């Protein structure tokens, strides 16, 4: 079981992908995080690929937990958000102040201060264009939808996903429904209706993704499956005739052998390929909005590999010297880097003879996650493996680069303060 609130170390990514059905990242997005396979997995990324190829609208959704520092370890999610925004995605960002109150006891006032000072100003400084940033506690649409989603799940499911026990308070138990509503509310009618939605996450957040994807499907009238043929079934106990006829008419305009069955509440169609499913799902979702306010497309997700902390393990706010905060003074960041662990050998002679081990080196991770020059990063990797690079040189070089970047970010952060009203929606 994965705990999305307290995962403290690395995962066996391939085992998790097999166990929970996370697919390989198979769409070649032109961003270094994807090119370097730092984004290891995906769910339904074909919906985003379809939207891009057909010039359709799509949503980009993420959230922030206002409980600690924004650091390089969680920065890559925003790097992806900015990348997808440049491709045309409509960005929404939730400040999880209700979740931070329920799971970590942080007051709403403190959460607001942390969200703005530690996160939102940095997002803008990094290049995020105006978008919708909101606080859970002030968004009535999210609260309403969370209430409605509660009618589509039960305690047995939540115990299975999260390990909840009788000692967990109801606010904590409700937090996953709030998070599901954060993502799904972007497809409500007032926000433009059904649309592909991508959520960049770490593997530790997969329980949330599984729940919200299941909830999205349960809110639909139509359920779509491809067996030997396409099967569109109608959920519920109401008379299905109107829905069956609508799906039948739609599919008959595209395929030749289409049959409907009122008794079994299904429409079947031959000759449908796997690649047709995305378009069919999107079309039926839009048709369904005539009858259903919650005709959601199950959200897509990208799964990123965790960044190593400078003291080993994953980069985490619980070990201050293991992370580089985006609010760190450049001198402090330099100190942390120079004191960081490496993948080097015990002596210079061994390093030259045996080569270093960049794959387990936190210093190399700084290059890999933060430097967009593919050629230089590959050169650093190869020279380390071949014993041509010493750890001290790498530390000094990346410390200089990070100090310069943090200094520039600090200036942009102050400029961003004047633009907050373009982002925060209340």
UniProtKB/Swiss-Prot annotation:
Main location: cytoplasm
Name under which the protein is recorded: Tryptophan--tRNA ligase
UniProt KW Repressor keyword: no
E.C. number: 6.1.1.2
Top enzyme category: ligase
GO cellular component, one term: cytoplasm
Gene3D superfamilies linked to this entry: HUPs, Tyrosyl-Transfer RNA Synthetase
Motif ('KMSKS' region): 314-318
Family recorded in the similarity comment: Belongs to the class-I aminoacyl-tRNA synthetase family.
Gene: trpS
GO MF term set: ATP binding; tryptophan-tRNA ligase activity
């Amino acid at each position: 079981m994965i705990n999305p609130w307290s995962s403290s170390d690395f995962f066996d990514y391939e085992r998790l992908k097999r166990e929970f059905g996370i697919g390989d990242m198979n769409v070649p997005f032109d961003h270094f995080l994807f090119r370097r396979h730092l984004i290891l997995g995906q769910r339904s990324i074909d919906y985003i690929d379809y939207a891009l190829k057909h010039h359709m609208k799509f949503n980009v959704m993420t959230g922030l937990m206002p409980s600690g520092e924004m650091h390089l370890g969680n920065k890559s999610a925003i790097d992806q958000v900015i990348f997808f925004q440049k491709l045309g995605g409509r960005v929404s960002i939730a400040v999880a102040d209700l979740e931070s109150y329920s799971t970590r006891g942080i007051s709403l006032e403190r959460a607001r201060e942390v969200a703005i000072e530690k996160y939102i100003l940095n997002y803008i400084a990094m290049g995020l264009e105006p978008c919708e940033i909101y606080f859970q506690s002030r968004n009535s649409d999210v609260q309403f939808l969370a209430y409605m989603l509660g009618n589509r799940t039960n305690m047995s499911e939540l115990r299975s996903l999260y390990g909840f026990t009788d000692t967990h308070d109801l606010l904590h138990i409700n937090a996953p429904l709030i998070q599901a509503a954060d993502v799904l509310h972007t497809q409500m009618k007032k926000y433009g209706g059904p649309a592909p939605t991508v959520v960049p996450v770490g593997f530790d957040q997969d329980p949330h993704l599984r729940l919200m994807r299941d909830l999205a499907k349960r809110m639909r009238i139509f359920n779509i499956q491809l067996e030997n043929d396409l099967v569109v079934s109608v959920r519920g106990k109401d008379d299905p005739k109107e829905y069956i006829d609508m799906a039948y008419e739609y599919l008959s305009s595209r395929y030749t052998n289409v049959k409907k069955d009122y008794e079994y509440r299904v429409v079947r169609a031959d000759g449908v390929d796997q690649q047709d499913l995305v378009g069919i799902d999107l079309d039926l979702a839009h048709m369904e909005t005539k009858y259903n306010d919650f005709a959601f497309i199950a959200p897509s997700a990208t799964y990123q590999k965790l960044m190593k902390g400078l003291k080993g393990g994953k980069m985490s706010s619980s070990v201050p010297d293991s992370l580089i905060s985006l609010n760190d003074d450049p001198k402090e960041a330099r100190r942390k880097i120079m004191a960081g662990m490496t993948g080097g050998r015990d002596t210079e002679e061994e390093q030259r003879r045996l080569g270093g081990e960049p794959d387990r080196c936190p210093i190399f991770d700084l290059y890999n996650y933060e430097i967009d020059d593919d050629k230089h990063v590959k050169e650093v990797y190869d020279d380390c493996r071949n014993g041509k690079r010493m750890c001290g040189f790498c530390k000094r070089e990346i410390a200089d680069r990070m100090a310069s970047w943090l200094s520039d970010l600090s200036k942009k952060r102050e400029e961003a303060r004047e633009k907050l009203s373009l982002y925060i929606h209340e």
